[in-house]
Amino acid sequence: MAAKEVKFHDHARTRIVQGVNVLADAVKVTLAPRAVMCLIERSFGAPVITKDGVSVAKEIELQDKFENMGAQMVKQVASKTADIAGDGTTTATVLAQAIVQEGMKHVVAGVNPMDLKRGIDKAVATVVDELHKLSKPITTNKEIAQVGSISANSDHPIGKIIADAMDKVGKEGVITVEDGKSLDNELDVVEGMQFDRGYLSPYFINNPEKQTVEFDDPLILLYDKKISSIRDLLPTLENVAKAGKPLLIIAEDLEGEALATLVVNSMRGILKVAAVKAPGFGDRRKAMLEDIAILTGATVISEETGKQLEKASLEDLGRAKRVELQKENTIIIDGAGEQKAIEARVKAIQAQIDESTSDYDREKLQERVAKLSGGVAVIKVGAATEVEMKEKKDRVDDALHATRAAVEEGIVPGGGVALLRARSRIVNLKGDNGDQDAGIRIVLRAIEAPLRAIAANAGDEPSVVINKVLAGSGNFGYNAATGEYADLVETGVVDPTKVTRTALQNAASVASLILTTDASIAELPKEEKAAVPAMPDMGY
């Protein structure tokens, strides 16, 4: 085992905080509509230019082991916020840095870190409760467009195209983002289906950047039983390999030898293949497999209908223009099934809805109708260069997640103002002792940080902006895009409540862990042996 270096108390925390500051300062420059870009070197190809906070955070690895631990902990804040809310990563990072910096002052002064944490938790819970009270439901197409625009760094065309997509496939509909072939953004609505099952093994992933499996023009095998032996699958795999197409297997389960063989073939590039579990359970699973079969023009391989897996032919396999497998979802786009068959299936399910007496069954049947008839909206992002395309796609993804979060929990005034307004609830909040009161004061000060960063990036004096906003009330705040003060909801500067809430909760969680850390352990750097000196010239 390699030797370890151990640091205690302030020596441990100080180095960790230095790492937090390096990452947060790099991410902070991307906050606000007038923020600057961050340029990221790539080991090959052109550098990436981005205003996406989580993209910046993911690139940071520090040489000092203790500083790197601090950076990685704050990176978790950004990643978790992105996973839950889809946006707010920069806000979460800025809040985490502010809580850590304010908290360190108290820890160094001898305040009990555990009571400090309890005070922070109490203040955060109160602020979150107030955010829910400030929240306003989002209903109109215009409001959806406003949320999307703000999240995409005030890019109004992006906000509009997302609002149009939601209008066409519904607020709960499936919307995907792809590279476009022109300079302009385009919106296509294609027949498609999404179900809540993801890839069975991460080794199937062929797009490591998005952590997804993506196949164009695949064949689709549907089987209603468990597959354990590769022998049953071999004839189908050989036929698919000859056809030169990717294969998606949807079955009750895949395990053991069968799954291992598919993974090895996929990793070696012998066959483009991936597998997912069939959606639903019991009779509902069979019905949903039949839905997928009708959508893709496949035949479900089932012993009940006399079909055996080892005798499946290419004619039994379904087809689609594209499939995308995520960790927890699968999307089938533009299946090759006949429109008449799909319409007949929808009518049959609607008849079942009319006859159903169970609210639960009716809800599940309605979900199936939506999956068959709703379609998938595809936003094709246009750009002049590959570098611009990557940056723009990141912003469209952020904006899409933000609008979904807004639909879910509503909106609050943007630009860091909602946190300032919610702060009023904790001004007079008291803890069980003085150390907990110090934790409450940390949050009171830290939730100014996002607005301070926004003002600084826009070239204004943060303290002046904070005081002017606090002098107003309600939705009155600072619009960084114009440099003016106005009703932010009326001018379209809004944030999803879920994004603001999640950013604060995740920031407080990780910052509290850093403040209560009293020892850090890291591997000692390996000593490089000196190279053997070259032989001197012997004069020959």
From Swiss-Prot:
<keyword id="KW-0067">ATP-binding</keyword>
<dbReference type="InterPro" id="IPR027409">
    <property type="entry name" value="GroEL-like_apical_dom_sf"/>
</dbReference>
<dbReference type="GO" id="GO:0005737">
    <property type="term" value="C:cytoplasm"/>
</dbReference>
<keyword id="KW-0143">Chaperone</keyword>
<feature type="binding site">
    <location>
        <begin position="479"/>
        <end position="481"/>
    </location>
    <ligand>
        <name>ATP</name>
    </ligand>
</feature>
<dbReference type="GO" id="GO:0051082">
    <property type="term" value="F:unfolded protein binding"/>
</dbReference>
<comment type="similarity">
    <text>Belongs to the chaperonin (HSP60) family.</text>
</comment>
<feature type="binding site">
    <location>
        <position position="495"/>
    </location>
    <ligand>
        <name>ATP</name>
    </ligand>
</feature>
<dbReference type="GO" id="GO:0016853">
    <property type="term" value="F:isomerase activity"/>
</dbReference>
<dbReference type="InterPro" id="IPR027413">
    <property type="entry name" value="GROEL-like_equatorial_sf"/>
</dbReference>
<keyword id="KW-0413">Isomerase</keyword>
<comment type="subunit">
    <text>Forms a cylinder of 14 subunits composed of two heptameric rings stacked back-to-back. Interacts with the co-chaperonin GroES.</text>
</comment>
<feature type="binding site">
    <location>
        <begin position="87"/>
        <end position="91"/>
    </location>
    <ligand>
        <name>ATP</name>
    </ligand>
</feature>
<comment type="function">
    <text>Together with its co-chaperonin GroES, plays an essential role in assisting protein folding. The GroEL-GroES system forms a nano-cage that allows encapsulation of the non-native substrate proteins and provides a physical environment optimized to promote and accelerate protein folding.</text>
</comment>
<protein>
    <recommendedName>
        <fullName>Chaperonin GroEL</fullName>
        <ecNumber>5.6.1.7</ecNumber>
    </recommendedName>
</protein>
<dbReference type="GO" id="GO:0140662">
    <property type="term" value="F:ATP-dependent protein folding chaperone"/>
</dbReference>
<dbReference type="Pfam" id="PF00118">
    <property type="entry name" value="Cpn60_TCP1"/>
</dbReference>
<keyword id="KW-0963">Cytoplasm</keyword>
<dbReference type="InterPro" id="IPR027410">
    <property type="entry name" value="TCP-1-like_intermed_sf"/>
</dbReference>
<dbReference type="GO" id="GO:0042026">
    <property type="term" value="P:protein refolding"/>
</dbReference>
<feature type="binding site">
    <location>
        <begin position="30"/>
        <end position="33"/>
    </location>
    <ligand>
        <name>ATP</name>
    </ligand>
</feature>
<dbReference type="InterPro" id="IPR018370">
    <property type="entry name" value="Chaperonin_Cpn60_CS"/>
</dbReference>
<keyword id="KW-0547">Nucleotide-binding</keyword>
<dbReference type="InterPro" id="IPR002423">
    <property type="entry name" value="Cpn60/GroEL/TCP-1"/>
</dbReference>
<feature type="binding site">
    <location>
        <position position="415"/>
    </location>
    <ligand>
        <name>ATP</name>
    </ligand>
</feature>
<feature type="binding site">
    <location>
        <position position="51"/>
    </location>
    <ligand>
        <name>ATP</name>
    </ligand>
</feature>
<dbReference type="GO" id="GO:0005524">
    <property type="term" value="F:ATP binding"/>
</dbReference>
<dbReference type="InterPro" id="IPR001844">
    <property type="entry name" value="Cpn60/GroEL"/>
</dbReference>
